[in-house]
Amino acid sequence: MNINVADLLIGNHILLLFVVLALGLCLGKLRLGSVQLGNSIGVLVVSLLLGQQHFSINTDALNLGFMLFIFCVGVEAGPNFFSIFFRDGKNYLMLAIVMVSSAMVLALGLGKLFGWDIGLTAGMLAGSMTSTPVLVGAGDTLRQTLTDGKSLSLAQDHLSLGYALTYLVGLVSLIFGARYLPKLQHQDLPTSAQQIARERGLDPDSKRKVYLPVIRAYRVGPELVAWSDGKNLRELGIYRQTGCYIERIRRNGILASPDGDAVLQPGDEISLVGYPDAHARLDPSFRNGKEVFDRDLLDMRIVNEEIVVKNNNAVNRRLSQLKLTDHGCFLNRVIRSQIEMPIDESIILNKGDVLHISGEARRVKSVADRIGFISIHSQVTDLLAFCAFFILGLMIGMITFQFSNFNFGIGNAAGLLFAGIMLGFLRANHPTFGYIPQGALTMVKEFGLMVFMAGVGLSAGSGITKGLGETGLLMLGAGLIVSLVPVVICFLFGAWVLKMNRALLFGAIMGARTCAPAMEIISDTARSNIPALGYAGTYAIANVLLTLAGTLIVIIWPILGG
């Protein structure tokens, strides 16, 4: 039996799609030096090569892929989007606007200078910024504005060609820029990070190892009574001195949870809750021959919960104002927009921030009720909310405006992005509404993106050889300019106009470019994770602005003429 693989793939679009995805994902794992190609560029290269051989898939798959991707981008941005937009994140908002607008202006200017069409220009912008949201926004707007089928097909082919040619240029140049720009600017990022650390009471070099607190019980002897000197627990401040807190006291056979007025007496048996290293550092007056093993004292359930910040008495307040240790709880991590932040007592909490808190179950529940809610640890997605807001996004995308003789539609990209932001925002405020496990959200987003890239590459592959011959070197040079010049502009704006700390500034610049590999290099250069504060500040808003940039560049292009 002879099987013609080409005929098999041509006759089965689903099989072709998954073959492209599998080969592209394998290619994406390859490295050029320290730079990994990545899934997006791997799938795009494979689909372009197969597209040259006249393989194709139904455009409905491409459209569904981009819709799923952009909707999930909105859901991820939603919890922190409005807090960044309206509050003290104005510096980060301005940096993101400067980055995206300067890149768009440069792309428009270079496109007109070299006589390219809007497809090549928008593709070059998307690739240089290593931003799939730009590609998605531009592709959707092209389908709205170009009514002639031949012109639309050519523009879409050029869009994917421009992206494919400049993506690696944008990624590699930004990674090298992250490594060498601080040195060229004579910026001492470790010193800048230490300055922020001193101002905010952080240890910039620490890599926190997270443990569950442990419970140990001790009998109060003369040494401990002498150490306490008749002070009550509030006055002693045991947590500040030991890193542990007293959860229970047994006195004269009676077990109780002490309040701040309790005074230690000889013969008391106390249970202490704290991290293992805190127990190891206890003063000998606690430990020497005094440890006891009592089921009632030790029988407590220690939990580690993810608490979502929601309530007004926590939002826009400093972390230190929560006084978690006064409530017998320990803070392990602070997560914002899926980015782990340095544990900074002066950090201002945003709605939707996730605090990883451990302690005795009852105390953790009390803290959660006070500041927000415990995140649902469920693998079940609220598909009804997902579908309802997806439909809402499509309906919003149908809205059109008319200015004189010019019609402008919001489009599916902007509509779905807005609906996704609203779903993410509502999820951060209502614990039982619209729940989507992070793993499921990431999977749908990545799958949608890969399907979109496969469709784009297959449709554009037939014209890639001609396009390379006409624009190859010019496109690479233009991509390098659009990749690096906005980074320099952002640095000058942040340093001289906003007067930002350099460690935070470089982190914010990488967030505005939504480039995690470059962020890792900045953190390594600073020998600290403090730049993550800046990265988180610009990341969510930049994803939204980049999608809008893809839409705007297509709308502005015919207005410029030429």
UniProtKB/Swiss-Prot annotation:
PANTHER family: K(+)_H(+) ANTIPORTER SUBUNIT KHTT (PTHR30445), TRANSPORT PROTEIN YBJL-RELATED (PTHR30445:SF10). It is a multi-pass membrane protein. Its main location: membrane. GO terms for molecular function: monoatomic cation transmembrane transporter activity. Belongs to the AAE transporter (TC 2.A.81) family. YbjL subfamily. The chain crosses the membrane at residues 8-28, 32-52, 66-86, 94-114, 158-178, 383-403, 406-426, 440-460, 473-493, 503-523, 540-560. This is Putative transport protein ETA_21820. SUPFAM superfamilies: TrkA C-terminal domain-like. Keywords: Cell membrane, Membrane, Repeat, Transmembrane, Transmembrane helix, Transport. GO terms for cellular component: plasma membrane. It is found in: Cell membrane. Residues 202-288, 290-373 form the RCK C-terminal domain. One of its GO terms (biological process) is potassium ion transport. HAMAP family: YbjL. NCBIfam families: PRK04972.1, YidE_YbjL_dupl.
